[in-house]
A protein has these predicted regions:
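Basic, Lys/Arg-enriched alpha-helical interface segments
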Residues: 1-118, 129-174
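Hydrophobic/aromatic beta-strand elements that line small-molecule binding cavities or substrate pockets
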Residues: 122-123
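Conserved beta-strand/loop element in small beta-rich adapter and peptidoglycan-binding domains
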Residues: 126
Length: 174
């Protein structure tokens, strides 16, 4: 089952129901500009997570990522953010690296998931509630220049706190 609705908290919602595992719900934060680039990344993100196993939710373990390629070639390292504590960790904020052309496709594609890194990042929160796994896309930082500005944002406590606040607002709205 797939559905799309809007609210003051999110601008898109898609739900996929599976008989033998969790239902998956994907949303885009209402503060995001729903342009063409984000729509493509959001669609690919849904495909990536829908093709992952339940054990790999919300993200594959570091060991799995070091040994295998991702389910969707456009995505690289997928990892939890831990700072500032405790809110970012409590809201289960993650980021995944997204292919941006700053490296050649042949080099990107030849690497296992953990080693596919760049400075274009998709931030999301994830949680499980009533046998449904929720993924809320919080931000997309497109930076093909590769000057590390997106990664520097993760060191900005105010920015990360704002992501955690939006994740908490979404989680509490359900």
């Amino acid at each position: 089952m797939e559905s799309e609705v809007s609210s003051d908290i999110f601008i898109k919602r898609q739900q996929f129901d599976y008989k033998e595992s969790h239902s998956l719900v994907f949303t885009l934060d209402a503060k995001l500009d729903d342009g063409e680039a984000l729509t493509k990344v959001y669609t690919d993100f849904i495909d990536y997570k829908c093709s992952s196993s339940d054990e790999d939710m919300p993200a594959p373990s570091e060991d799995i990522q070091k040994d295998y390629e991702p389910q969707n070639s456009f995505f690289g390292k997928d990892t939890a953010n831990r700072f500032p504590k405790p809110k970012v960790a409590n809201e289960n904020i993650h980021h995944v690296h997204v292919f941006d052309g700053s490296r050649s496709w042949s080099i990107w594609e030849a690497k296992e998931q953990f080693y596919r890194v760049c400075d274009t990042l998709l931030f999301y929160s994830s949680f499980l509630k009533s046998n449904t796994r929720y993924f809320h896309v919080l931000d997309f930082l497109y930076n093909p220049v590769g000057d590390n500005k997106s990664h520097q944002k993760m060191k900005d406590d105010i920015y990360m706190q704002a992501l955690a606040d939006r994740a908490e607002l979404y989680r509490k709205s359900l």
